[in-house]
């Protein structure tokens, strides 16, 4: 989403740069009566609840990327999901459905992880990650 917004912002700046340089631009103050406060996002908010529906989980993955990130804990290790997509796999929430890390959600759908980062390690695509991972089909997260 950040990438999409950066392109939109660049286009808007180019559309208005002449007005800005010639002091012809008009600026609108924020209406403070409509402003809201958003508290700082805490790391723990990134913990994935696999009983949630797939849409909410993928929203958390995308919304918290890159920092603090959406994550799960397995065997005492933290794994940050950097990218994923909704799939139609069915299983118990948190169950790994196959050997390329597709994880069941609470709504009879699943999240297929495509990029992941183990705590203290570099980000990896799922193929690289699975070569050295002990997480396999049937594992419960």
Regions found by a protein language model. Give the residues of each.
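Active-site-proximal loop/hinge segments within enzyme catalytic domains
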Residues: 1-87
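An anion-binding loop in the catalytic cleft
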Residues: 51-141
